[in-house]
Structure formats: structure tokens, C-alpha cells
């Protein structure tokens, strides 16, 4: 599933299906028809008449209708209104609900990853900068807020910590905020999110 609908602009939805059906031995017309009805897509609509959200939903309907076990999505929710994003994310969760299928989602919208991802991989200029279960980031990691004078002690005591210096203070990403709270009870430490984690892994230092 690409970030732009790849089908020729003059083709109608029904013609796209006619072209794709012979290519997939497990193509399911009934499933496809149900999906486009759910999405409000008319089979006579031309590709050029579809909004970006509708084009994305059409691609996903196609992907779900030929027995795929793994969906590959490139920025599937970028540029969509909140309702369309929610609908696509709900559908992806339904797809993996049986535990037998998977989704590989490329996205810059970190809140979407928090909602649907089991594992998050951060990539910068082709280099993997972290690879972690989502709950390790959102349920365990934390952002500590401290004075510059406290940073050296924290970095010495907390393996894997990364610091970002502010104008009058410092923020430190810590791998386990519960252990950190026991070691430094006087330092405020908040729950991290995927966006925080990515920022600190890119910009933070030791």
C-alpha cells in the first residue's frame, strides 16, 4: 500500500478489479465488494475522482481481498483527516486480530504507532537507531527533568540514558522510569511516548 494511489487515473474501481483478479489465485470478490461498500467507494468511480483517503482505502481493500498475510504500508495515514485515519487504523487492528497476520507500517505520525504497533523501529538516513517493543517505550521509559548539575550523576548511574540540554535545565531519556524514581526520587520523571523516544535517540547525547 503506497502513499499515493498507483492505479491509472482514468480507470474505474470495477476496471481495477478486472485487471487485478487474474493476478491473485485467492482473490475474493465478495470480500472486496463488502470492503468498498464499508468505505463508501462506488465501483463506477474513476481513480482521479477519489480523494487521497479514498485512494488509500481502495488500496487497502485490494490488499485485504487476495489472502495476504502481511501488509506493507508506506505513510498510509499521512494527510488524512482524523476520521479516515481512525478507520484505517481500526481496520489494521482487525487484520492482525487473529495473530496469524502482520502489518509493516512506515509512518512519521508517532501517535499512530503508539496506537497500533507492537514493535517500533526508528530509522535515520538508512540507519537503524533503535528497535524496541512499543510497550518498552510507552510503558517503561521516561523523561526526567533535572538541573544541568545533576546530569553527570544520572548518566553515570543510568545505562542507556540520553540527555537533551534546554536553556535553563536538561531532559534525560531513561530506559526505566520506575527504577529511576527509586534511585532519584527528587527528580521529576514523566512517561515517554514514541515521539519523545525518537527525538532523544536522534538528538540526545551521553
Regions found by a protein language model. Give the residues of each.
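ABC transporter nucleotide-binding domain
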Residues: 89-174
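Helix N-cap at the start of a conserved alpha-helix in ABC-type nucleotide-binding domains
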Residues: 82-84
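Short loop/turn segments at beta->alpha junctions
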Residues: 12, 133, 190-193
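C-terminal coupling/interaction segments
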Residues: 162, 166-206
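ABC-family P-loop ATPase nucleotide-binding domains
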Residues: 2-59
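Conserved catalytic motifs of ABC-family nucleotide-binding domains
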Residues: 67
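Catalytic Walker B motif of ABC-type/P-loop ATPase nucleotide-binding domains
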Residues: 71-75, 80
